[in-house]
Amino acid sequence: MTEDACRIDVWLWRARFFKTRSLAARVVEEGGVRLVRGQSRGPVDKPSRAVRCGDVLTFAQGPKWVVVRVEAFGERRGPATEARALYNVLNEAGATQRTQTPGA
């Protein structure tokens, strides 16, 4: 990948949303992650899909939906404080209950 993009499974793992990269890849393959980039939006089904700064991702974390904007890529899976700099949370601390698929 180029410096202005990162694989979605790698980014989700580096941002510490998933414990392993393979778990992040599985969730992506199962259609559990939605991507919004400009006017383009929809589910992501390939872990190799590139994310760019400014992209908005929606995915489930336990019983709640998480909506984040990608701010940076990072170079490693660092501590939580380092990972937190990779994104901005757009919903209020996961306040959206997971009762239905967002956008459905």
Model-identified regions with their sequence ranges:
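Strongly charged
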Residues: 2-10, 14, 26, 34-104
